Regions:
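Nucleotide-activated donor-binding/catalytic signature segment of Leloir-type glycosyltransferases, i.e.
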Residues: 242-267
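Aromatic "clamp/platform" in nucleotide-sugar-dependent glycosyltransferases that forms part
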Residues: 284
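Glycosyltransferase donor-sugar binding loop
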Residues: 42-43, 175, 228-246
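Nucleotide-sugar donor phosphate/pyrophosphate-binding loop at the beta->alpha transition
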Residues: 104-105, 115-137, 154
């Protein structure tokens, strides 16, 4: 069976969890079947990977139009595939067109949902309407839909009631615990100005409304003064949020704030995660949150928002602490001050008890190893492909 994975992100251009997912899923699927990858951007040297640039004439168009232009070329390349599997709205339209054009079965993995990310209008303008349209059409017509968490499945069926529950199955994201493992060296820390002899709180993520960095920076005013704050944060969605975050960082009245804005190589991130006392995930929308698994695999305690699929990853009181959030329709907290205070309280609880933080970190790695292996995820995905190819229901009866 030839499977074409359709994605915006693929190494070396990986910015978020969806890109990480496709990278590792492709690696494991290649052991099981003929797997091709079709991605955005510059050509890749890897065999079996085709990349597509924005078509000529669309260079100055709205970003959403550029995406749809790439998708049309990507769909043309899918001729001959036995099944196409698209990831995120950026590639959903390509899979949808390939299904219509060639009759190829189409599987969609939902890593997020456009109706639950209204702040994307700040980035895409009117293109947000296009992204929502592309996602809805692909999901409605797909032969099978994979949700990366039970929370995502619930959100999807609520957002798109036209989707039959029998077509939606849950297959979690995973983690390579051989690669993501504790690194006790400190050279990376010292090079970036992090004092390895002092405790620190770390955030790793893009500067977006979704990732909640603004809320973390408000909470940081209440962190224990002895703790460093390390922000591995870049790729802002808009100039406006970049300016807001910059002002908040400058306004922190504390020493030991380290802001690394460039994208770091994975081994450097692993070392930074390893030595942190606490990893913080303040997201207001997170269908799964691979980054929490990455921290857990590095034996680091996690403080994360109790939203989306995060509670399926972070075991509250065992591998970390969850922060309750009372959310508005757009995901933002009704009471931002209370959310920031609760975030600070849980971070400080672990800073004050490093032995507890260490125990949670150890439990987190065990959980990551036992429940989130990419090998098992690829096997379950392959089982779904076979069912779809045979024309069977994606979710077995009973």
């Amino acid at each position: 069976m030839r499977v074409d994975l359709l994605t915006r992100e693929y190494p070396p251009d990986v910015y978020g969890g969806a890109g990480v997912h496709v990278e590792y899923l492709a690696r494991e699927l290649r052991r099981l079947t003929d797997t091709r990858v079709r991605c955005f951007g510059a050509p890749r040297p890897e065999e079996g990977v085709a990349a597509y640039r924005v078509p000529g004439g669309l260079e100055t168009a709205n970003a959403a139009l550029q995406v749809l232009g790439v998708d049309l070329e990507m769909a043309a390349g899918c001729e001959g595939a036995d099944l196409v599997h698209s990831h995120t709205w950026y590639a959903n339209f390509a899979g949808h067109v390939a299904k219509m054009l060639y009759g190829t079965p189409h599987v969609v993995t939902t890593h997020s949902l456009e109706p639950l990310r209204p702040w994307k209008a700040e980035q895409l303008g009117g293109g947000y309407t296009l992204s929502s349209w592309a996602e809805r059409g692909a999901l409605a017509a797909a032969d099978a839909v994979i949700a990366v968490s039970e929370g995502m499945r619930r959100d999807m069926l609520a957002s798109y009631p036209e989707i039959s529950p029998e077509r939606v199955t849950v297959i979690h994201n995973g983690i390579d615990t051989g690669e993501y493992a504790p690194d006790r060296d400190t050279g990376v820390l010292e090079r970036h100005g992090i004092d390895p002899s002092r405790p620190y709180v770390v955030f790793v993520g893009r500067i977006t409304r979704q990732k909640g960095l603004v809320h973390l920076l408000h909470a940081a005013r209440g962190f224990h003064p002895d703790a460093q704050l390390v922000l591995c944060a870049g790729a802002p969605d808009t100039p406006e949020i970049a300016a807001e975050v910059t002002a908040l960082v400058r306004g922190l009245d504390r020493e030991g704030v380290v802001w690394i804005s460039e994208m770091l190589p994975r081994p450097e991130v692993i070392q930074i995660l390893t030595h942190a006392t606490v990893f913080v995930c303040p997201s207001v929308y997170e269908p799964m949150g691979i980054v929490n698994l990455e921290a857990m695999a590095c034996e680091t305690a996690v403080v994360a928002t109790a939203t989306g699929g995060i509670p399926e990853v972070v075991a509250d009181g065992s591998t970390g602490l969850l922060v309750p959030i009372d959310q508005a329709a757009d995901g933002t907290p009704h009471d931002p001050d209370a959310f920031a205070a609760d975030l600070a309280e849980r971070v400080n609880r672990l800073l004050a008890d490093p032995a507890l933080a260490a125990r949670m970190g150890e439990a987190g790695r065990i959980r990551a190893v036992e429940h989130f292996s990419w090998e098992r995820i690829a096997e379950r995905t392959m089982e779904l492909y076979r069912r779809v190819a045979r024309g069977e229901a994606p979710v077995p009866a009973g």
